């Protein structure tokens, strides 16, 4: 994902000042300054590099239900046009791991318990030292919220995700 964002930041004349940015997911129970937070990763790869109109970060401290409700309200105010996403080694998009991915989810933002494969990916990607240090709970945009965007751009670097991409494209929907 970093390659895509870096490339986007170098395209001349993109109207960044008209972009309202959201991010798709983040861990609960990490301090706001934790480098593993996706808001902080995006800060370093995108938010600090271009003059965005607004940036909405998922807060990770507070009551999870209130976090979800407040973020969902912001999404109603500024619906998503474009999503840049990837696929995890277990096939997750955002933090919609296969066991909780719901194409009929009535919510737009929800709390999820992360699948162990997803958590191990965070260790394998050197974001955390051990699986025990990876948060178990997270906030994520739901599948219907993601699919409501006008356009989705999915990039999946790394051979370790080959099976997940193949299953996503050619496998049965379960």
Model-derived segments and spans:
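ATP/nucleoside-binding phosphotransfer catalytic cores, i.e., glycine-rich phosphate-binding loops
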Residues: 141-144, 148-174
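Class I SAM-dependent methyltransferase SAM-binding "motif I" and its flanking Rossmann-like core
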Residues: 94-141
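Glycine-rich N-terminal segment of FAD-binding domains in flavoprotein oxidoreductases
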Residues: 1-12
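Gly/Ser/Thr-rich loops at beta-strand to alpha-helix junctions
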Residues: 1-3, 89-92, 160-161
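Glycine-rich phosphate-binding loop
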Residues: 78-103
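Ligand-binding beta-strand-loop-alpha-helix segment within the catalytic cores
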Residues: 14-84
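A short alpha->loop->secondary-structure connector
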Residues: 12-16, 102-104, 173
């Amino acid at each position: 994902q970093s390659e895509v964002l870096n490339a986007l930041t170098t395209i001349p004349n993109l109207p960044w000042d008209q972009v309202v940015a959201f991010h798709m997911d983040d861990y609960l129970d990490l301090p706001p300054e934790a480098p593993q937070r996706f808001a902080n990763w995006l800060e370093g790869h995108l938010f600090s590099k271009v003059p965005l109109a607004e940036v909405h970060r998922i807060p990770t401290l507070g009551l999870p239900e209130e976090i979800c409700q407040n973020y969902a309200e912001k999404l109603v105010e500024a619906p998503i046009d474009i999503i840049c996403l990837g696929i995890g080694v277990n096939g997750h998009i955002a933090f919609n791991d296969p066991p909780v991915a719901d194409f009929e989810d009535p919510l737009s933002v929800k709390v999820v318990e992360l699948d162990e494969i997803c958590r191990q990916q965070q260790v394998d990607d050197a974001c955390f030292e051990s699986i025990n240090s990876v948060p178990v709970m997270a906030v994520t945009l739901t599948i219907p919220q993601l699919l409501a965007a006008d356009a989705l751009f999915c990039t999946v670097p790394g051979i370790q995700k080959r099976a997940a991409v193949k299953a996503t494209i050619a496998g049965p929907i379960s």
